[in-house]
Regions:
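Short beta-strand immediately N-terminal to the catalytic nucleophile in serine-hydrolase-like folds
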Residues: 1-3, 28
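Conserved alpha/beta-hydrolase "nucleophile elbow" surrounding the catalytic nucleophile
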Residues: 3-8, 138
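Short glycine-enriched nucleophile-adjacent loop
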Residues: 8-19, 25
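Flexible "cap/lid" loop of the alpha/beta hydrolase fold
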Residues: 16, 25-61
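Conserved alpha/beta-hydrolase catalytic His-Asp/Glu region
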Residues: 61-127
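Short beta-strand/loop motif that positions the catalytic acidic residue
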Residues: 129, 135-137, 141
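Conserved alpha/beta-hydrolase "acid-adjacent" motif
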Residues: 142-148
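Catalytic active-site module of serine/aspartate enzymes centered on a nucleophile-bearing elbow/loop
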Residues: 157-188
Length: 188
């Protein structure tokens, strides 16, 4: 089971409840919080892009359902990657087009409804994840500082960490060949 970013949170939560259905777990650019203080520290250290802050406002959530300025998309991507040379007009257009697809903006708005309790769990619960697990992180991740993956490494018995230098949050875009090779090696 593979998850990136918030999908990583979904992946480890799914793994806790469905270990018998999984052969392995891959968590990419995701965080784990063992208590409210860790979550508050995360929010203090990691400055989200303006677009992410806007979805916390009910007014902007409704507004973004109808208009999504391209500049917000570009700013969100720029803050999520280490190497700014990959933030091309073509990439921004691709992301913007995806956001403009029917239902996407409503779904993004629903992210604001996720409660902080959804992000917090007992670190000891991770010990239940006994399947081989690969934890992947960018060392220059501005959205999820690498220190917020410690619980994965400390508590998951069969966890292996791979961190990429000069890589931000968008690992699949920033180092796609290296990531796919590392995943292939992990699976084999």
């Amino acid at each position: 089971f593979v998850g990136h970013s918030m999908g990583g949170m979904i992946a480890w939560r799914y793994a806790l409840d469905n270990l018998d259905q999984l052969n392995g777990l891959i968590i990419i650019g995701s965080a784990f919080f063992g208590n409210e203080q860790e979550f508050e520290n995360f929010q203090t250290i990691n400055a989200p892009p303006v677009a992410f802050e806007l979805i916390e406002s009910k007014f902007f959530i409704r507004l973004l359902e109808y208009i999504t300025p391209r500049i917000l998309v570009k700013e969100g991507i720029s803050q999520s990657v280490y190497d700014q040379s990959i933030v091309t007009d073509e990439l921004v257009d691709q992301f913007h087009d995806i956001i403009l697809m029917e239902g996407t903006r409503v779904a993004v708005g629903r992210l604001a409804e996720v409660h902080e309790d959804d992000f917090i769990a007992n670190p000891l619960d991770l010990r239940k994840i006994t399947i081989p697990s690969l934890i992947v992180h960018g060392e220059e991740d501005n959205l999820v500082d690498i220190k917020f993956i410690d619980h994965f490494i400390e508590q998951i018995p069969n966890a292996k960490l791979i961190s990429y230098p000069k890589t931000g949050h968008m690992i699949p875009m920033e180092v796609p060949l290296q990531l796919s090779e590392d995943i292939r090696e992990f699976i084999n």
